[in-house]
């Protein structure tokens, strides 16, 4: 018995690899949290399980008559040459689904959509302002330390129903909300040049006519800017599905409303502090479109393909991290699955083998 429980725990864990750092927009987009769909080329519409239910696909949820309570948690580790190693452990989703009639399912849940959890970025090298550009008439050295934390979450309601023998549909409505803090510490120093490296904080050295000059930082001053942003908005998505004996087609359209942002800036310099608050919102709506197809080769195997076109998330530009807007996304996903079914009554009914790729 212990062996079977151990195998269930091992096979229920999903592993994903991050290849970039989302220091723009509102942070990292939290994608698919279902390990089964991740293995199927990061699919949104298909999972390859025996019921062909995908957590992120409202038009498939009616296929189960059971009440389902789900919690997903994930750990991310990111190592780059530009920034310190980043470690993140967070709750990725929570949801409850239950039947409300024949072939009808209702559900609600909470999950993050964009997130930066304690992201720390520090300039490794000093930057310089020459005496001809400095307001003090003397050279200045400076560097920044940034701390970014928070993002946007969604509280969602969804409904799924089988409409006819071949057609089903689903709808999902989300309230978007969240807070994000960006702390910017700017350290500035007066720069003095000397032929001796002793005394003061050495920040650089220069060779001039075979003589070495050492740049030293003195009279350090820290200027701190705390930006607190409060987000609010909504989105709605509708999905339709057609399925017959061999083929399955899915189409999904999501509309994002205008995101409202309330920003509070607090500037602290030496012994003075100033605070200002303002509100603004995105000027346009945005939309996401997805199209999927699954072909059943045999009763226990099949292949799938999906195409997604996602518009940039609609936030005001001055509310984006480092004023860099999130990009739009276009992707294509391929997946395949094979089910090993157990004809005997026991501790397991089938073993699913999946593979996929996306770009």
Language-model-derived ranges and their functions:
Residues 3-13:
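Sec-dependent N-terminal signal peptides
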